[in-house]
């Protein structure tokens, strides 16, 4: 049971971090200079539905931008909406409470504080439904800081035993699902072929600084695929995530779950990926 809770602690932490980043990028884009980019709005709408930030019945951002925005903001703290930021944050707290003895006091305090601050009662105009994008962004930025700190605790402050490997596997499964889906939708909608959509994709992969350090002002698909798909030194790239999953599963298969070694072998080996094939 502890192993299962560690696995879900990893998944909920990664999922919360991902949907928080997506919500921030969406609100920033809807209120920035690029709000007229139709491919970007189409991608943001598709991602919002895909990641559960808005319901499928909500009009797309390109059709009714403010309705889409208000729906996203209203859903952030809905714990009954099973894909909301708030629900996933409560999921972290629930899984962590079941493995409290495996976590440092600082790690536990971070989780409790993040949940308390995110669900803190709104006051004044906020209670009347007038919760502005700026207010929501501040709320999301605070949570982003907390989830980044949780990631640090899980990465550097836990013993790397089989329980930790399950937590890590949970995180990387979630990361692979979210990022591969984002890239697929970016290609389907054509958003990555426009400057605003290109930058939003790199930001969702949390790779903006790395990208501009390596490629300066380039915005071509070869550079995008190289960093976000192929780069096995970038912990946000698909290759790094798959490579790490293979290693974690193989190690787990040596000790407690022989079938996991077989799962690891079934995952594609990033060492065999070819940039020329993937970027065509």
Question: What is each PLM-predicted segment?
Answer:
Residues 1-280:
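Alpha-helical transmembrane segments and their helix-helix packing motifs
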